C-alpha cells in the first residue's frame, strides 16, 4: 500500500517513507492511496484477541512494508501491562453511553496509544530505507502530545526530540510532565503565543527547504510526532475497532449494528481516525465532533466556512484550545473525491486570509457524516458534576465536553443508536478544574488537589502523576515563535 499527498496526487511513496517524512515538502499530509477493507467476519475474529493483537492486525493493513511479526512485537512492547495495565483501552458502560477510556498509558492521555508505538515505527522505517541519519522529532503541543512524545522517544538511540508548548496554555500537571522529563536527547521550551503559533512554527520549519537541506548535510533528518504524521494517526484507528469488539462482547451493541462515536476535538486527528475506521468497514452511523469555546469546527461543520479569525480562549480543556485543525485537511481531501487542486486552494486561502469556504457539495458530504456542537467551561463543569453525582463516573474536562455535546445531540435528534464517547485524559491531569466543577475546595498545591480528588472519587492516582511531586524541573525557558529554528539548532543538533 502506497501513500499520496493531500496537495499532490502525483506523489506515491511507501508507508515507511511517509512515516519518516512526517509531512510532504509542499505542506500536504499523507494518506493511503486506498483504504483496506475490514469485513464483519474480520471484526468478529478480533473479538477474542488481546488489545496488542487487535492493534497489530489493523495497523498491518495500512503499513504493508512491515511484517506481521514485526508489528506484533512492536504492539506487544508498546501496549504491555507495565505501560498500560491489564486492559489498555477499556470500554465502560455509564448507563446510556459507553466510555472508551484512552488514558491508562504512561502519561495518562490518549496520545500514548500512538506515541508509545511511533518510536518503533520510526526507527524501523529508517532501517528499511537504509537511513543512518539522526532523526530529530519536532512537536508542537497543546498539552498531551508533548509529554507522550517525550516519554516515547526519551533515550531512543538515533533520535532527538524537541517539544514546543504555549506559555500559560496547559494545565500545571501537563506543564510539569514536560518540564521534568528525563533523557539525554530531549528538549522542551514554552513559546509565547498559543498552540497555533507553535504548530505554525513547526510546519514552517518542515517546509523550509534550505534549512532541511542544511540539516541533511549534517546527517540530521526532521520528522514529526504530531498527528500530521501518518504514523501517529494509524494506531488510533485500531482502538475504535477494539471498542466495537468490546461493546459487542458486552452486549451493548448487537454485532453488525451501527454505533455513534463522539470525540472531543481540537486538531481533528482523533475523530479522523474514527472516520477512517468507518471507511475500512467499521459500522458507524454518525460522528459527533465536540468542541469547547474555541468552536471553529462547530461553525465550519454547520456553515461550510472555516474561519480562524476569531478570539482565542484559554479554557479548562486546553488540549482543544486550537483554531487551526490540521487534520481537517485530510477530511477535505477524502470527501472532495481526492481533489488535490481543491484542497490546495482551501489551504492557500487559509494561509492568506485565515479562512475558506468549501463547495456546497463538499459541505453536504461533511454534514452527512459529522454532527457537531460545543460546550463552554460552564457547560463542561456542569457535566462533570452531574455525571459524577448521577452516574458515579468522573470525567476530565475534555471528556465532559464530549458527553455534553453528545447528550445535546441525542436530545435534539432522538437518535438512540448505541454510542461510544472517547475519554481522552485522566481527570487527575486537571484536578483543579474537576474539583471546582464538583464544588470542592481548590486551595493548596497541585499535588494537594490530586490527593483531594482521589479521596473524593475513590480512584487511584496514576503512579506517574503521583511521582511528579518529587521531580525537579529541567526546562523552564520561554521563547518567541521566531526563535524556534535557532532553539532547535542550538539545542538538538549536537
PLM regions and their residue ranges:
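PLP-dependent amino-acid enzyme catalytic core
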Residues: 1-494
Amino acid at each position: 500500500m502506497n501513500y499520496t499527498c493531500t496537495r499532490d496526487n502525483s506523489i506515491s511513496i511507501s508507508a515507511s517513507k511517509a512515516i519518516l517524512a512526517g509531512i510532504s515538502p509542499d505542506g500536504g499530509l499523507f494518506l493511503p492511496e486506498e483504504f483496506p477493507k475490514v469485513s464483519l467476519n474480520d471484526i468478529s475474529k478480533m473479538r477474542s484477541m488481546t488489545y496488542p493483537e487487535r492493534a497489530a492486525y489493523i495497523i498491518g493493513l495500512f503499513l504493508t512494508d512491515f511484517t506481521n511479526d514485526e508489528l506484533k512485537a512492536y504492539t506487544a512492547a508498546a501496549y504491555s501491562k507495565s505501560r498500560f495495565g491489564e486492559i489498555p483501552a477499556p470500554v465502560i458502560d455509564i448507563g446510556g453511553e459507553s466510555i472508551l477510556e484512552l488514558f491508562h498509558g504512561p502519561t495518562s492521555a490518549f496520545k500514548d496509544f500512538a506515541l508509545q508505538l511511533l518510536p518503533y515505527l520510526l526507527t524501523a522505517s529508517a532501517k528499511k530505507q537504509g537511513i543512518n541519519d539522526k532523526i530529530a522529532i519536532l512537536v508542537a503541543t497543546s498539552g498531551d502530545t508533548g509529554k507522550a512524545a517525550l516519554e516515547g522517544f526519551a533515550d531512543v538511540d538515533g533520535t532527538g526530540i524537541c517539544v514546543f508548548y504555549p506559555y500559560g496554555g496547559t494545565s500545571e500537571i501537563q506543564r510539569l510532565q514536560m518540564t521534568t522529563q528525563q533523557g539525554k536527547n530531549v528538549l522542551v521550551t514554552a513559546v509565547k503565543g498559543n498552540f497555533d503559533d507553535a504548530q505554525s512554527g513547526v510546519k514552517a520549519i518542515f517546509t523550509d527547504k534550505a534549512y532541511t537541506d542544511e540539516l541533511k548535510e549534517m546527517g540530521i533528518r526532521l520528522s514529526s510526532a504530531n498527528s500530521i504524521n501518518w504514523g501517529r494517526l494509524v494506531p488510533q484507528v485500531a482502538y475504535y475497532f477494539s471498542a466495537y469488539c468490546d461493546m459487542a462482547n458486552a452486549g451493548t451493541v448487537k454485532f453488525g449494528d451501527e454505533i455513534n462515536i463522539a470525540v472531543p476535538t481540537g486538531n481533528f486527528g482523533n475523530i479522523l481516525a474514527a472516520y477512517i475506521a468507518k471507511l475500512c468497514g467499521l459500522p458507524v452511523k454518525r460522528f459527533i465532533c465536540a468542541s469547547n469555546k474555541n468552536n471553529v469546527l462547530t461553525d465550519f461543520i454547520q456553515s461550510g466556512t472555516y474561519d480562524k479569525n476569531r478570539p482565542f480562549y484559554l479554557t479548562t480543556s486546553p488540549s482543544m484550545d486550537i483554531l487551526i485543525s490540521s487534520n481537517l485537511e485530510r477530511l477535505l481531501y477524502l470527501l472532495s473525491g481526492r481533489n488535490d487542486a481543491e484542497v490546495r486552494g482551501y489551504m492557500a486561502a487559509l494561509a492568506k486570509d485565515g479562512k475558506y469556504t468549501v463547495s456546497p457539495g463538499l459541505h453536504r458530504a461533511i454534514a452527512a457524516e459529522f454532527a457537531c456542537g460545543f460546550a463552554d467551561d460552564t457547560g463542561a463543569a456542569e457535566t462533570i458534576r452531574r455525571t459524577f453525582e448521577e452516574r458515579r463516573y468522573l470525567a476530565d474536562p475534555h471528556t465532559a465536553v464530549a458527553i455534553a455535546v453528545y447528550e445535546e445531540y441525542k436530545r435534539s435528534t432522538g437518535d438512540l443508536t448505541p454510542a461510544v464517547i472517547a475519554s481522552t485524559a485522566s481527570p487527575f491531569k486537571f484536578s483543579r478544574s474537576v474539583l471546582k466543577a464538583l464544588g470542592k475546595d481548590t486551595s493548596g498545591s497541585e499535588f494537594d488537589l490530586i490527593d483531594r480528588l482521589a479521596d473524593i472519587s475513590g480512584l487511584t492516582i496514576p503512579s506517574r502523576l503521583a511521582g511528579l511531586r518529587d521531580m525537579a524541573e529541567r526546562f523552564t525557558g520561554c521563547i518567541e515563535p521566531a526563535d524556534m529554528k535557532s532553539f532547535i539548532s542550538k539545542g538538538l543538533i549536537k
